[in-house]
């Protein structure tokens, strides 16, 4: 063995590298068409539920929560609890009215989930926008300041209302790609949401 590569072997290797590179480079117009189809698919996604965990860091505090989110059109229910079920709360919302109930039977009401959580926790969290981000699309009614797509036309990163949203993973749910992890960042506030147990009832 001389350790030298034959011209034929080199040519074959170069051809394989070129072809594999071409397979990864999707034309921009094709990715945009894939993204439009992706958005149309999400427009039909009105009824769903998902479980997961959320890790929040804000103003020197760190909180880890279990969550279950059920969405039925414009009506939603979010159940949150700390480790071992501690501090369980339930948020029930519809346009113009949101109610938070804790395990002791106490309740509070506001016009939006952002207003409610700010009053109860002191944190500004984009719950209304998260309803859209959690299924992988830009939030309705907010300007998109930045958007990048992955090679199959799904959002890779977007920015809205000062929040940077990074989609870190996807899972197939009955033929629809839905996020398995979403990271949110705004200033010193960071929130990581790991999602599992997706269920659709929009068929």
From Swiss-Prot:
Keyword Membrane applies: yes
SUPFAM superfamilies: Prokaryotic lipoproteins and lipoprotein localization factors
Domain of life: Bacteria
Membrane-topology annotation of the record: Lipid-anchor
Coiled-coil intervals: none
Compartmental location: Cell outer membrane
Lipid moiety-binding region (S-diacylglycerol cysteine): 22
Keywords, ordered alphabetically: Cell outer membrane, Chaperone, Lipoprotein, Membrane, Palmitate, Protein transport, Signal, Transport
Entry GO CC: cell outer membrane
GO terms under biological process: lipoprotein localization to outer membrane; protein transport
InterPro entries: LolA/LolB/LppX (IPR029046), OM_lipoprot_LolB (IPR004565)
Endpoints of the signal sequence: 1-21
Lipid anchor positions (N-palmitoyl cysteine): 22
Alphabetical list of Pfam families matching this protein: LolB
Major location (coarse): membrane
NCBIfam families membership: lolB
Family: Belongs to the LolB family.
Descriptive protein name: Outer-membrane lipoprotein LolB
């Amino acid at each position: 063995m001389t350790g030298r590569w034959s011209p034929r072997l080199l040519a074959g290797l170069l051809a394989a590298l070129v072809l594999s590179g071409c397979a990864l480079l999707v034309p921009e117009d094709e990715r945009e068409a894939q993204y439009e189809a992706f958005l149309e698919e999400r427009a039909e996604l009105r009824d769903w539920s998902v479980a997961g965990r959320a890790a929040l860091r804000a103003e020197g505090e760190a909180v880890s929560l279990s969550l279950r989110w059920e969405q039925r059109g414009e009506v939603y229910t979010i159940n949150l609890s700390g480790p071992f079920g501690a501090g369980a709360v339930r948020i029930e919302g519809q346009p113009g009215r949101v109610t938070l109930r804790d395990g002791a039977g106490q309740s509070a009401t506001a016009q939006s989930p952002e207003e409610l959580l700010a009053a109860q926790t002191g944190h500004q969290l984009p719950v209304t926008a998260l309803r859209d981000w959690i299924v992988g699309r830009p939030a309705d009614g907010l300007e998109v300041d930045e958007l990048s797509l992955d090679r199959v036309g799904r959002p890779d990163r977007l920015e809205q209302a000062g929040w940077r949203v990074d989609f870190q993973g996807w899972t197939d749910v009955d033929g629809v790609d839905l996020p398995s992890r979403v990271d949110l960042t705004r200033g010193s506030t960071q929130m990581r949401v790991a999602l599992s147990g997706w269920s659709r009832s929009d068929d």
